[in-house]
């Protein structure tokens, strides 16, 4: 089951062509990523980073820029999990505007790390279960 989140394209995201500058779209996706942890796993990303010392840095990205994100657009993100490995998680992102137009699609692989050593570690069981509940095609 996918998580759906929304944000607006604001002025600091724009480039000289008056559309979202592509690195800002990755920043937006990361904001959605951080926000998705609470509905998916019941824990906030700051809690994981600061208290549990667990992080999920991106190690692989495949992205299609389909249409521009424009100033004032409301971006609706649909985020689902494609795969949960021993220490990796594959995320699937789809960003649509307020008209339902698909603007951006990305698959991103993250790896669970200990934030002190930055060494890979297995995804903790409580997080694994939450992520598995949001596998693509799984309905609740």
PLM feature spans:
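Terminal targeting signals and extreme-terminal segments of soluble enzymes
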Residues: 1-76, 82-140
């Amino acid at each position: 089951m996918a998580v759906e989140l929304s944000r607006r394209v604001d002025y600091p995201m724009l480039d000289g062509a008056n559309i979202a500058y592509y690195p800002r779209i990755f920043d937006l996706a990361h904001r959605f990523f951080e926000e998705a942890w609470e509905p998916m796993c019941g824990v906030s990303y700051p809690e994981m980073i600061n208290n549990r010392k667990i992080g999920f840095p991106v190690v692989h990205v495949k992205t299609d820029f389909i249409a521009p994100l424009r100033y004032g657009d409301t971006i609706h993100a649909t985020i689902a999990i494609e795969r949960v490995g021993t220490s990796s998680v594959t995320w699937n992102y789809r960003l649509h505007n307020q008209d339902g137009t698909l603007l951006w699609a990305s698959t991103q692989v993250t790896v669970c790390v200990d934030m002190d050593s930055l060494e890979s570690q297995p995804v903790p069981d409580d997080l694994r279960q939450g992520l598995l509940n949001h596998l693509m095609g799984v309905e609740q």
